[in-house]
């Protein structure tokens, strides 16, 4: 997840954050969904995208970022989403929405 920079649209942010946090690069994004994180309290909106045709590279994390990336098969990701291994709400929403879309 990342913050929209001034003048940046959500797709640009997604491409930038993908590279910074994982090292992967893409120019092909498909919007998946967007939603409010805490309606009634905040107007913060989460935008989800599906990135394809990825090119691997080194992550470019900011100082202090503690991120561990995992590559797992799709069935394992779904198991992790459903058994409570994945606890991050935006990750769960993204995985479950994409799972429905790909059926």
Task: Please place each PLM-identified region on the residue numbering.
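Nudix hydrolase/Nudix homology domain
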Residues: 2, 31, 39-42, 47, ...
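A short, charged helix-loop
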Residues: 59-60
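Helix N-cap/coil-helix junction residues
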Residues: 23-24, 86
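Conserved Nudix-box catalytic region and its N-terminal flanking loop in Nudix hydrolases
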Residues: 1-16, 54
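A short coil-to-beta-strand element that immediately follows conserved catalytic motifs
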Residues: 25-32
